[in-house]
Amino acid sequence: MTLLLSSLQRLARSLAVLMAACLVVVGAQAQPMAIPKYIAGEHYQVLPEPIKVVADDKIEVMEIFWYGCGHCKDFEPLIVAWQKSMPDDVAFARTPAVWRKQMRPHAALYYVAEALDLPHEVHIDLFNLLIKNRSLNDQKKFAAVFARYGVSSEDFDKLYKSFGTTSKVNKAEKRLRKNYLSQGTPEVVVNGKYRVSSGKGVSQAGMLEVVNFLIELERSAKPVAALSAGAAG
């Protein structure tokens, strides 16, 4: 009798464990699957091959723009404001768009301004100049813009036609065609993996919300030790 009672008790305990496990499974199945706020192919594109970023310890955010693009000028105050609250583990960079021959001189202007470390206002002046005439390729008019910031025409001409500037333009063109697969501006590439554009239900302000989402996605994929340098900014 004692042996039978012991066997029944063990059976009861086994049944209790089994029932508890079944309840856990049923409960888990009843929970709805979390739906991502932003979806690849709809709100952003996944690049076919990841692109090497400059700083391995940072999440890179790369803006693609063109001075002849009115939408890029509209996006400018948004991206500038976003930069001010950018987390410490994020690195921001820009690359001028180069798809056509007429865009090469405009890309060179960006690299001249970068080399001279000119204030942000020069970019606004270049937007204003080139949005009015997208095919403009007048070195004297370009130099006149830089003269407002104390750059002599001689210094401008030297940098504008320099081997270094030409090399950067060539590199930007190759990168956009073969790596970023960019076809419009403004666009933002997050950590060399995701390309974000406006349109199709994504506004310019919405672009930055998608960018923030992708930053979190990349941050969550980093090793735990790297997270201590996370969004402290």
List where the protein language model places each region:
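C-terminal cap of thioredoxin/glutaredoxin-like
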Residues: L3-L5, R148-G233
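Alpha-helix N-cap/helix-start motif
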Residues: C72, Q102-M103, S135, Q139, ...
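Extracytoplasmic/secreted envelope proteins and their assembly/folding machinery
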Residues: E76-Q83, H106-Y110, H123, Q139, ...
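Structural microenvironment flanking redox-active thiols in thiol-disulfide oxidoreductases
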Residues: P87-A115, H120-A147
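Extracytoplasmic thiol/disulfide redox context detector
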Residues: T2-K101, E216-G233
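Solvent-exposed loop/turn segments at secondary-structure junctions
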Residues: Y67-H71, V98-Q102, L129-L136, S162-T165, ...
